Amino acid sequence: MKISIRRYRPDDRKAVLAAFRSNVPAHFPASEESWLRSALDDPDGPLFVAVEAGEIVGFGGYELSEFYDLGTLVFGLVRADRHGSGIGRALLAYRLLHMAGRKLRPRYVTVDTHPHTAGFFKRCGFIEIARWPGGYRSGRDRVDLRFDLTDEAVARLRACGWREAFARDGTA
């Protein structure tokens, strides 16, 4: 697998929406597409795409809080036919390192997700901080997780790359 990650561009929109739709309904309710469209039109932070063989196979971004020592991951998704290939881990590591390079680097990074994807984040070193039955308007349960973006975590990501930094056994 040879992927590259770069900033999202408006001409990526169609491929990003197609990647999102490939995950409906298993990972996203169709109703979240309007939120994605809004985020693409008026992002609150940087957005990125993962590209493999010239095709967009993943998408995600983050937002930084103006008032809190906090970054929030938004729309981390991989095209359904590429799940399990490591693209999600690479995109996650890229976003964490991008945040770490910011002038106002956040101390904590949070993400909210569905129970079926919470395990992915736990294997990448996130800890569960809240669980909300029916926490999404769609009726799905919500899980909130946090990653401590410490100097040690950043050094591990830089030194050994995303594969080794996010050990499959859950130790990060």
Residue spans of the language-model regions?
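Conserved catalytic-core motifs of GNAT/GCN5-like acyltransferases
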Residues: 110-112, 122, 127-144
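Active-site rim helix/loop that mediates acceptor-substrate recognition in acyltransferases
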Residues: 26-49, 61
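Short hydrophobic/aromatic beta-strand element in the GNAT-like acyltransferase core
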Residues: 45-49, 59, 75, 108, ...
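Conserved beta-strand in the GNAT
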Residues: 49, 55-64, 70-77
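Short amphipathic alpha-helix that is part of the acyltransferase structural core
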Residues: 1-34, 51, 156-172
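Conserved acetyl-CoA-binding loop-helix of GNAT-fold acetyltransferases
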Residues: 78, 84-97
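Conserved GNAT acetyl-CoA-binding A-motif
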Residues: 99-114
